[in-house]
Amino acid sequence: TSKIVKPALDAVKNGEIKIIPASGEKTYYHWLNNIEPWCISRQLWWGHQVPVWFDKDGNQYCAVTESEAQEQAGSDVQLTRDPDVLDTWFSSGLWPIGTLGWPEDSSALNQYFPTSTLVTGQDILFFWVARMIMMQLAVRNEIPFDTVYLHGLVRDAKGKKMSKSTGNVVDPIDIIDEYGADALRFTNASMASIGGVLKLDTQRIAGYRNFGTKLWNAARFASLNEANFGVSVPTAKETVNRWIVGETVKTLKEVNI
C-alpha cells in the first residue's frame, strides 16, 4: 500500500494538490495514515466485472482480457470468469481517465487530463477524492487535479443527514411549490459556506420568502407611482467605487433579461 498511499499523501503535503477549506486536509491525512484492507469485489447486478478467471482446480488468472487469461492458463484449460463486480468506489476512482478513453491514448485524454478543480462534498473526501488521487498517480504518475473544493452539505433542520429510510428528506420541488423558487435560492445562497453544513429549515425559507415579498412590493409600489429611475448618479472617483460600479454593470448585462 505504501507505493500507492505515500504518493497521494505527498501530493497534498507538498502543495501539488490544495484542499479547500484547509481543514479537509486533516480528514484526508487521517484516512490515508490509517488505511485499512479493502474488499473491492461486490455481488451486484451491475458494475465492472472482476478481471479474474478460474480453472476447474481453483487456480486463478488475472488479466486484462479473457484471451490473455487463456494464454496464461494454456489453450486446453477451460476457464470461468469470477461473477463478482468491482466496488463502485474502486471503479469511480478511475473516473478522471476512464471517461476520457483510457487506457487508449485518446485526444480527449491528452486535452482534458489532468484537470484543474474538483468540486465535491466533504463526505466523500476519502471514498472518492483520495482514491482518485491514489489511482491516477499509480496508473499515470500524474495528479488528476490541483484543487479540491469541498462544498457544504444540505441536511435537515436538526443537522441530520437526509435519508429516505429516516423520512427526513426535503424535496426541493415541494419547497418551490409552497414558498417559491426565489425563496429557496435566497436561503441556499445566504447560508452557503465552504465545507460546512446547511440546515434546511422551512421556517427560515418562509422568512426569506417574506423578505423577498417586501422587496417585490416596494419595487412594485415605486414602479406604479412613477418613480424616477433616471436620477443622476455622481461619477465614482475612488478606485474601489469605480470597481463596484463596473462589477454591477457586468452583472446587469449577464442577468438582466
Predicted regions and their residues:
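Structured secondary-structure scaffolds
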Residues: T1-F229, P234-T235, N241-I257
